[in-house]
């Protein structure tokens, strides 16, 4: 790696651009200046902290600490899924469904990719495991939260349709099949779009970062393809599991639609 | 064909509702709005949690899966919902005679549901339900959006069919005239109970 060293004062220079933007929006009375500055400050602080954590983690490199880090990331993304719901299931079900489906998909895809494709030594080498898991969780989280949000919203909005189908003797799965399909589509659209546009419209963030950090483009491309495929698989399986479980939970054991199990998030 | 029995049904304000509807019999329910007529039908259809149970012949509500119960005991709501593009896609089999009897034609099956009037929806919802061959019917004001002529036309088609198929029917109705034409028996909801009213004076 022959990355050009980036010093903190150079970042200060970059931050002055954000400050300038905030000043402009402030004078134009757009009311965005404050949240822009807060978000920029959060980026700097959070990433600096995670940088320290990763340095320490890479130095220790034990399976325990990697696993602990993975679980912390999982729980935080589970919380994030719930926060993005307009309506959520009562009694912590949204958190549970989101977390479990992300665990099943993101963790198993990460482990599978580490073992079967990248094959570092040891297999849980945090230098590979953590970034890969992070990217998978981030994208699966988007898919799961979009999927769940769409499903619960249509259950409320289209209650008449679902119940009328139940009245005609359809099973709960048939009665909500259209809405499950819509929810899956909503969850998977971002990754399908970014796979289709990769390299043509956009240079994916990870690849750009790698090239900037000095990797040869050919290698960066291979890693990017790998990441795209694992993200697609992780998002797809995660969204599928979450939407299927949530749909089941919207009906009780008598196959009645129970919108009373939803509460405004 | 089997009769429909309500045993100790409790839902909303209604408590301890007992009712036997014989095969081929129409029992009319009436009561002020908000008295729980629709909820009673929903409870019999097992669409919402309720106390007590219902029975179709020897089969108890809770003994079969929800969708199997509702495949026998079908409810037609006051406001029907439509999910496919065309009318025909909602029918389980072509219903040329029913459509003709209600003033529609063969072409109606290809109509787009987005252009149906509320009266058309109401009649077609009934055709849609009967195309699935229910064994009991729960009708929630099925003629509320129809004018007098269309109402009579619907009754002239539906009543013989109910008798021929020997379906037990719970029919939520408003007008006293209509109840006199249809009902074997008539119950008015009063508070938590059903009070039997004379049908013919």
Spell out what each predicted region is.
Chain B
Residues 45:
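Helix-to-loop junction immediately C-terminal to a conserved catalytic motif
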Residues 60-74:
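ABC ATPase NBD coupling module
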Residues 72, 79-98:
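Q-loop/switch helix immediately C-terminal to the Walker
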Residues 112-116, 120:
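Conserved ABC ATPase signature
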Residues 126:
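Hydrophobic anchor residue at the start of the ABC signature
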Residues 137-141:
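Catalytic Walker B motif of ABC-type/P-loop ATPase nucleotide-binding domains
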Residues 172-174:
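H-loop/switch region of ABC-family ATPase nucleotide-binding domains
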């Amino acid at each position: 790696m022959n990355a050009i060293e980036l010093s903190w004062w150079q970042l200060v220079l970059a931050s002055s651009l954000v400050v300038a933007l905030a000043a402009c929006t402030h004078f134009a009375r757009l009311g965005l200046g404050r949240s822009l500055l807060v978000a920029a400050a959060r980026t700097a602080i959070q990433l600096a902290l995670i940088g320290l954590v990763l340095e320490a983690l890479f130095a220790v490199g034990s399976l325990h600490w990697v696993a602990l880090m993975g679980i912390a990331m999982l729980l935080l993304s589970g919380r994030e899924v719930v926060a993005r719901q307009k309506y959520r299931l009562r009694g912590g079900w949204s958190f549970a469904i989101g977390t479990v489906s992300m665990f099943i998909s993101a963790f198993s895809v990460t482990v599978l990719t580490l073992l079967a494709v990248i094959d570092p030594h040891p297999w849980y080498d945090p230098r590979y495991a953590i970034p890969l898991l992070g990217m998978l969780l981030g994208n699966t989280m988007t898919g799961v939260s979009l999927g769940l949000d769409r499903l619960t919203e249509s259950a409320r909005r289209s209650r008449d349709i679902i119940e009328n189908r139940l009245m005609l003797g359809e099973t709960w799965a048939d009665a909500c099949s259209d809405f499950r399909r819509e929810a899956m589509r909503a969850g998977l659209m971002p990754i399908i779009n970014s796979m289709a546009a990769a390299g043509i419209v956009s240079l994916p963030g990870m690849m750009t970062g790698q090239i900037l950090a000095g990797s040869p483009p050919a290698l960066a491309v291979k890693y990017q393809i790998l990441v795209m495929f694992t993200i697609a698989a992780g998002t797809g399986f995660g969204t599928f599991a979450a939407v299927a479980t949530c749909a089941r939970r919207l009906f009780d054991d008598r196959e009645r639609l129970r919108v009373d199990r939803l509460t405004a998030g | 064909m089997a009769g429909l029995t309500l045993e100790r049904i409790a839902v909303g304000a209604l408590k301890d509702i007992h009712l036997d509807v014989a095969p081929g019999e129409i029992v009319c329910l009436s009561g002020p709005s908000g008295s729980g007529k629709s909820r009673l039908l929903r409870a019999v259809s097992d669409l919402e949690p309720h106390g007590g149970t219902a029975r179709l012949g020897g089969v108890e509500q809770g003994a079969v899966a929800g969708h199997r119960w509702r495949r026998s005991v079908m409810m037609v709501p006051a406001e029907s919902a439509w999910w496919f593009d065309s009318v025909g896609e909602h029918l389980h089999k072509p219903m040329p005679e029913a459509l003709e009897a209600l003033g529609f034609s063969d072409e109606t099956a290809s109509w787009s549901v987005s252009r149906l009037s509320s009266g058309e929806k109401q009649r077609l919802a009934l055709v849609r339900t009967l195309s699935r061959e229910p064994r009991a019917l729960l009708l929630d004001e099925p003629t509320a959006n129809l004018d007098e002529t269309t109402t009579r036309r619907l009754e002239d088609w539906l009543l013989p069919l109910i008798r021929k198929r020997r379906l037990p029917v719970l029919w939520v109705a408003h007008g006293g005239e209509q109840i006199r034409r249809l009902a074997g028996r008539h119950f008015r909801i009063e508070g938590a109970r059903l009070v039997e009213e004379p049908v013919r004076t």
